[in-house]
Amino acid sequence: MAGFCDSLGSCSVPHGLTRAIAHPPSYGRTDLSSGRRLWVNSAALSPAPYATGPGPAPSYAAATLAVPGSLLGASGGLAGADLAWLSLSGQQELLRLVRPPYSYSALIAMAIQSAPLRRLTLSQIYQYVAGNFPFYKRSKAGWQNSIRHNLSLNDCFKKVPRDENDPGKGNYWTLDPNCEKMFDNGNFRRKRRRRGETSEAAVPGASSPEGTALEPRGSTPQDPQTSPSPSEATTTCLSGFSTAMGALAGGFGALPDGLAHDFSLRRPPPTAAAHSPQIPNTAPGFAPGHQTGATGFRMGHLIYSRDGTEV
């Protein structure tokens, strides 16, 4: 800062220089657009000096933050969604990078419907896809294989042999009339149905009027003479065993005569002796309250054994 100092050491700043400091120059930036911009002084970039008090808030903190007018559209928002800011060459390059939102089946259907006779060869389908969608011009190996797979596996595409009077190579592909209604605005909604699902879709017993369709799928009526049935002896034995367990919970008085005699304290049950270890009876004078505990140990072996031969 330039100033004038006298011999006594006091300095003063000229009035014109004070006004120049209060209003800094614009440094020749008036050639930019007239939109509102945010100017940051050097004080905002440098660290704040140490101060003893809080002091007033800086003046640049209340400055209006505005986006330059050159980045705003006519409506005040970013107008880049319609790609108007891109040149024609830039838009074409963007179309080469973005994949079209159509499935391969939709591309095939679009190509077939664009033909005058509604039929095209495989090479003509390739030409249609590559000519109308620049994305598929880069690599042809991947999507061409997908086109062939969709033609072979999708039931909506039918192969038509070439006539004898029609010279050329390859068969024609046409669209099934039943599937034309399912093609709407490039969205091929029909999904390929597997052959296994088609065979399983038939409901068994639907042709019989007696209402056999209520039977579960895969179940066939069994002949009681030919199909094996559970053993009657095993069922009777388990039924008797369940009855004995219910009676045991109520007390020994409700047990049958044979089981009550087997579960006595003087003699262990003969069927449990062959399959479970016996507990020696050291106290022949047990009270009736101890009988359930002593017998319950041997019955636990019968309950948790899974061989099925203990009863």
Swiss-Prot record:
Residue ranges of the region described as Disordered: 188-237, 263-294
Protein origin, superkingdom: Eukaryota
Keywords: Activator, DNA-binding, Nucleus, Transcription, Transcription regulation
InterPro entries named among the record's database cross-references: Fork_head_dom, FOX_domain-containing, TF_fork_head_CS_1, TF_fork_head_CS_2, WH-like_DNA-bd_sf, WH_DNA-bd_sf
DNA-binding region ranges: 99-193
Compositional bias segments (type: Low complexity): 219-231
MF terms in GO: DNA-binding transcription factor activity; sequence-specific DNA binding
A Pfam family hit: Forkhead
SMART domains in UniProt: FH (SM00339)
Alphabetized SUPFAM superfamilies for the sequence: Winged helix' DNA-binding domain
GO cellular-component term (any): nucleus
Compartments (UniProt record): Nucleus
Function: Possible transcriptional activator.
Protein name from the UniProt record: Forkhead box protein I2
